[in-house]
From Swiss-Prot:
GO process annotations (BP): L-histidine biosynthetic process
NCBIfam families tied to this protein: histidine_hisI, PRK00400.1-5
EC number per UniProt: 3.6.1.31
Keyword Oxidoreductase: no
Pathway: Amino-acid biosynthesis; L-histidine biosynthesis; L-histidine from 5-phospho-alpha-D-ribose 1-diphosphate: step 2/9
Location relative to the cell: Cytoplasm
Record PANTHER family: HISTIDINE BIOSYNTHESIS BIFUNCTIONAL PROTEIN, HISTIDINE BIOSYNTHESIS BIFUNCTIONAL PROTEIN HISIE
Protein name from the UniProt record: Phosphoribosyl-ATP pyrophosphatase
Signal peptide (from-to): none
Gene3D superfamilies reported for this sequence: MazG-like
UniProt xrefs under InterPro entries: HisE, PRib-ATP_PPHydrolase-like
Amino acid sequence: MSQFTLADLERIVAERASVTDGTSYTASLVAKGQPKAAQKLGEEAVETVIAAVSGDRAGVVSESADLLYHLAVVWNIAGVALEDVLQELQRRTAQTGLAEKASRPKG
């Protein structure tokens, strides 16, 4: 099992985003801004879906890696930390979806 984590990815993206010598794809993507980074994220999401629908397991793995990378870039530009997302996931999974829905105000 891999020891690589999403926290590792977050750190690597942050490090590479600040490279100024023209060698970093991450830095060039960050320099193009959130619209371009979000576009790339969307493209990778679609490619992941296509691989999944096609039953292409290797494609799903490869495209998922691209998807997670581009998501980390979007988070970096937006100033969103992985920890923020994990806390939101924890909050959402603390109760079942039906219990959460029932707890919403009526009306």
